[in-house]
Amino acid sequence: MFRLWNQLTKPRVTVLVLATVLPGMYLGTTGYPSLTVISITLFGTYLMSSASFILNQYIERERDAVMYRTKQRPIPAGEISPTFALLLGIVVAIVSFGILTYFINLLTAVCALAALLLYVFLYTIWLKPRTEQNIVIGGISGCIGPLIGYAAMANALPMQAWVMFLMIFLWTPAHFWALAIFLKDDYEFAGIPMMPVVSGIEKTVNQIFLYAIAYSLSVIGFYFVDDRMGYLFLLSAIVLTVLILGFAYRLKLSMDKVLAKRFFFFSILHLFLVSIAIVIDSKI
């Protein structure tokens, strides 16, 4: 059962979501956030993220069955029924909303629920099967982590929270398009219009490079938005910017699928390190 839960809920992806919640929590209070509030907020967010992925796999069960990467997921593999997955996703989402509303505040719960609704309805159902820009618009759902964190501490969403939202919004296309390059044949076989399938790898790597530039500018720009950010964050942002732009430029020149996969994983590490830098510098 634990194995099936992990396959349904993508815990490794959820860890990154939770990592983007923490900076919002640390910026949302003048002191240190309560360990109890942190734990409940992260647990509630974990449940809502898990519900999103369960419902995503319910909706995509037929596409998953024809893709090599996903055909062994629990629903297409016949290990659980679609009806059970649907009910499980709904119940987990309700539990998450209840926990966040009762123990934290309604704004936090609404932000978490908005992330689920955007991911399930806007991205999975509407955009993903229809346009190569699916991840640009649909990726909004993955940007809400800082809003959840800030709302949990301040019960408000000031400019700093929205700049962090923008940061992740600009990070998302380069991150996912790199994976789409590596999995181009799989997406093409399943008829999913990811950018490498529709427009080719050359256009995709050019777009990755442009989004990497925009994302890097937003990271450095955060230093000027929040006066709690000091030279530690600025130095970290500059070093990380040089690294990701260098990586994106190499990918632009080579158009290599293996390098695209490496960029995908590096971008995860990059966002994680940016989040850590924000957390540390906000309290020293």
From Swiss-Prot:
Signal peptide start and end residues: none
InterPro entries membership: Protohaem_IX_farnesylTrfase, UbiA_prenyltransferase, UbiA_sf
GO MF, any single term: protoheme IX farnesyltransferase activity
Keyword Membrane attributed: yes
Keyword annotations from UniProtKB, A to Z: Cell inner membrane, Cell membrane, Heme biosynthesis, Membrane, Transferase, Transmembrane, Transmembrane helix
Membrane topology: Multi-pass membrane protein
GO cellular component terms, semicolon-separated: plasma membrane
Enzyme Commission number(s): 2.5.1.141
Short name of any one Pfam family annotated for the protein: UbiA
Stretches that traverse the bilayer: 13-33, 35-55, 84-104, 106-126, 134-154, 163-183, 205-225, 229-249, 264-284
Location of this chain's protein in the cell: Cell inner membrane
Swiss-Prot/TrEMBL catalytic activity: heme b + (2E,6E)-farnesyl diphosphate + H2O = Fe(II)-heme o + diphosphate
Gene Ontology biological process terms in this record: heme O biosynthetic process
Pathways involved: Porphyrin-containing compound metabolism; heme O biosynthesis; heme O from protoheme: step 1/1
Keyword Cell inner membrane: yes
General function of this protein: Converts heme B (protoheme IX) to heme O by substitution of the vinyl group on carbon 2 of heme B porphyrin ring with a hydroxyethyl farnesyl side group.
Family indicated by similarity: Belongs to the UbiA prenyltransferase family. Protoheme IX farnesyltransferase subfamily.
Note: Carbon 2 of the heme B porphyrin ring is defined according to the Fischer nomenclature.
Matching HAMAP family: CyoE_CtaB
Name the record gives this protein: Protoheme IX farnesyltransferase
Species this chain originates from: Leptospira biflexa serovar Patoc (strain Patoc 1 / ATCC 23582 / Paris)
